[in-house]
Design a protein with these regions (language model features):
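Hydrophobic membrane-insertion alpha-helices, especially the h-region
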Residues: 1-9
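Extracytoplasmic
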Residues: 14-310
């Protein structure tokens, strides 16, 4: 029996999924992705597979330039619960990157969640506070919680861009800033960038990621709703009813496809509203009302703010 436990300790269960390369090549091979403006990239399409499931549970597109580590460009979950990453729109991302390349000065620094930071650095050629694959939070169904360590190890090996201890600490500080009260959060962001001109990019899906890392500050949930005849406004009664029945205070929407919308619900805690919650377009308030940072651009689920200088 002791020998068996020793074996399990030295040979832990592997990650419950694997990345399977389906297709790889230059941008021209993936003309439907809309990446013509980045001809120097090599694109890889991967299916995320589980041995016991016939179909992939997700599809990922990653990009590389030269010998640099790969960057996740797009993720499509094929099951109801997010796995690995959250669904995103590549067309929104490329439009965002084009706007940043055009309007954000070369000498400025961009702050964003680490995955968006790597995308901005690759597509917009701008300096970002985070450059590594920090891998937080680990997004996995509850029945995989016992294999979080194996998942983290597999992800580090696959993406080949582990962070330094300093960058990991800086990211924790960044997360704390977003989860703080608005004025305190901005002051913390200013400490991170010093005297540099700085811009902050947030996306509605960051609400889910921040809620996983700071649940005591951001009590949230999400639910997908079918979209009929492309009528988003027609969803309002259904979404509001779910919100009321589950005791949430407000919601924000993300378009997943022409047939589905995801609603993110937020419950205000006793600690007050976070800086991040102020930056998102909830139905009862808009980011335009936020005074502590300057809204400079919005496209789809992305919102760009200029952080005031110290």
């Amino acid at each position: 029996m002791v020998g068996w436990f020793a074996y399990l300790w030295l040979n832990p269960a592997p990650a419950p999924y694997r990345y399977h390369l389906v297709e790889e090549g230059p941008v021209g091979k993936f003309d439907k992705l809309g990446l013509e403006g980045w001809p120097g990239l090599t694109i890889g399409k991967y299916e995320v597979r589980v041995d016991s499931v016939d179909k992939p549970i997700a599809v990922a597109y990653r990009a590389t330039r030269g010998d640099a580590p790969p960057v996740l460009l797009n993720w499509e979950n094929r099951i109801s619960e997010p796995v690995g990453s959250v669904d995103s729109s590549l067309s929104e991302l490329t439009t965002l990157a084009t706007a940043i390349a055009k309007h954000v000065p070369k000498e400025a620094v961009v702050l964003a969640w680490w995955d968006i930071s790597r995308q901005v650095r690759l597509l917009a050629d701008r300096d970002t506070l985070f450059t590594s694959h920090l891998g937080l939070p680990i997004i996995a169904p509850s029945y995989w919680r016992g294999r979080i360590g194996a998942i983290a190890k597999y992800e580090r090996e696959f993406w080949s861009a582990p962070p330094s201890a300093e960058e990991s600490l800086t990211f924790e500080r960044f997360v704390d800033a977003l989860a703080s009260e608005a004025n305190q959060g901005v002051a913390m962001l200013q400490e991170l960038v010093g005297s540099r001109e700085a811009y902050l990019v947030v996306h509605v899906t960051d609400l889910y990621k921040l809620g996983l890392l700071r649940p005591e500050r951001l009590d949230m949930a999400f639910k997908d709703f079918p979209l009929i005849s492309n009528n988003v406004h027609g969803l309002a009664p259904q979404v509001k009813a779910w919100m009321k029945n589950n005791n949430y205070d407000r919601y924000a929407l993300q378009s997943l496809s022409e047939k589905e919308v995801r609603a993110y619900f937020l419950r205000e805690g006793t600690n007050g509203t976070t800086l991040f919650a102020h930056m998102l377009p909830f139905v009862d308030r808009t980011p335009v009302e936020l005074q502590v940072v300057q809204l400079v651009h919005n496209h789809g689920g992305y919102w760009i703010y200029k952080i005031p200088p110290v």
